[in-house]
């Protein structure tokens, strides 16, 4: 796969691959996810999730083998992207109802700085906003203390990506370290500023409309996402180093 042709937006380390899996593969994944034991689900305030691959700790991963159906899809992502130095070993599966989202956040330091998110079910808009600390020189400085120069401002602007079902979003490096990413909890999503406009226009149904010039769609299904990552440090026993 020539990943460069899937790059979107002005931040050079964000890639959006539409139709990464087929309808049949999406159905198979959903069957596996909802066929898992009820105890596998953890319910949070704004979503519920499944954790696969083991427990992530600041000192590394206490591993648990991925099931074959996850090994298969993560191997495809690993081989297609060419961005992970070794096999993906951790997957978080999140389920969102139409009125649920996730606050802007940054993934922890335990992970290799590449994230691959496979989307199933309802489309949604993911927003990226610059971190309060922007990279400058040898370290991080406060955005308030030293605003980004005009020449680099476009790379630090907020942006959004429309995540269609069966698509794969990959972001790394600056997009990983210098931006927060999140999803609005509104069932009505605006896609005026998405960087993959062509894909946004390809999505249509009778519920879509324009309000005061805004391009919007209504989330009417459950969204499921697979967040696939690599934890480089693997600990067979957390208390032995």
UniProtKB/Swiss-Prot annotation:
Binding site residues for Fe cation: 105, 107, 181
Entry keywords, A to Z: Abscisic acid signaling pathway, Dioxygenase, Iron, Metal-binding, Nucleus, Oxidoreductase, RNA-binding, Stress response
Top-level EC class: oxidoreductase
GO cellular component terms given for this protein: nucleus
Main location: nucleus
Deletion consequences: Faster germination of seeds under cold, salt and abscisic acid (ABA) treatment conditions, but not upon dehydration stress. Reduced survival rate under drought and heat stresses, but increased resistance to salt. Enhanced cotyledon greening after ABA application associated with reduced transcript levels of ABA signaling-related genes (e.g. ABI3 and ABI4).
Induction: Accumulates under a salt stress. Reduced levels during cold stress. Seems not influenced by heat, drought and abscisic acid (ABA).
Fe2OG dioxygenase domain segment(s): 87-232
UniProt: 2-oxoglutarate binding residues: 223, 229
E.C. number: 1.14.11.-
Any GO MF annotation of the entry: N6-methyladenosine-containing RNA reader activity
Cofactor binding: number and manner: Binds 1 Fe(2+) ion per subunit.
Subcellular location(s) of the protein: Nucleus
One BP annotation, GO: negative regulation of seed germination
Needed cofactors: Fe(2+)
Function: Probable RNA demethylase that binds to both N6-methyladenosine-containing- (m(6)A) and C5-methylcytidine-containing- (m(5)C) RNAs, thus being a probable m(6)A and m(5)C eraser. Involved in responses to abscisic acid (ABA) via the modulation of the expression of ABA signaling-related genes (e.g. ABI3 and ABI4). Acts as a negative regulator during seed germination under abiotic stresses (e.g. salt, cold and ABA). Positive modulator of seedling growth and survival in response to drought and heat, but counteracts tolerance to salt.
Similarity section: Belongs to the alkB family.
Name of this chain's protein: Alkylated DNA repair protein ALKBH6 homolog
Organism: Arabidopsis thaliana
């Amino acid at each position: 796969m020539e990943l460069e042709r899937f790059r979107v937006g002005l931040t050079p380390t964000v890639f959006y691959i539409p139709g990464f899996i087929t309808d049949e593969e999406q159905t198979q994944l959903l069957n596996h996810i909802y066929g898992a034991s009820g105890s596998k689900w953890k319910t949070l305030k704004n979503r519920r999730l499944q954790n696969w691959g083991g427990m992530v700790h600041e000192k590394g991963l206490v591993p648990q083998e991925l099931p074959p159906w996850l090994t298969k899809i993560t191997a495809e992502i690993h081989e297609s992207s060419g961005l992970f130095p070794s096999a993906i070993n951790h997957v978080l599966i999140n389920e969102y109802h139409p009125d649920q989202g996730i606050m802007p956040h940054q993934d922890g330091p335990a992970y290799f700085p590449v994230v691959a998110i496979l989307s199933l079910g309802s489309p949604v808009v993911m927003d990226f906003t610059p971190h309060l600390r922007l990279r400058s020189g040898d370290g991080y400085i406060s955005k308030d203390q030293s605003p980004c120069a005009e020449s680099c401002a476009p790379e630090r602007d907020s942006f959004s990506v429309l995540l269609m079902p069966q698509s794969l979003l990959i972001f790394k490096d600056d997009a990983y370290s210098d931006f927060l990413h999140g999803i609005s909890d509104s069932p009505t999503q605006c896609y005026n500023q998405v960087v993959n406009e062509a894909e946004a226009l390809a999505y249509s149904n009778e519920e879509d409309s324009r309000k005061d010039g805004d391009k919007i769609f209504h989330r009417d299904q459950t969204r499921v996402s697979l967040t696939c990552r690599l934890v480089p440090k693997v600990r067979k026993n957390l208390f032995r180093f």
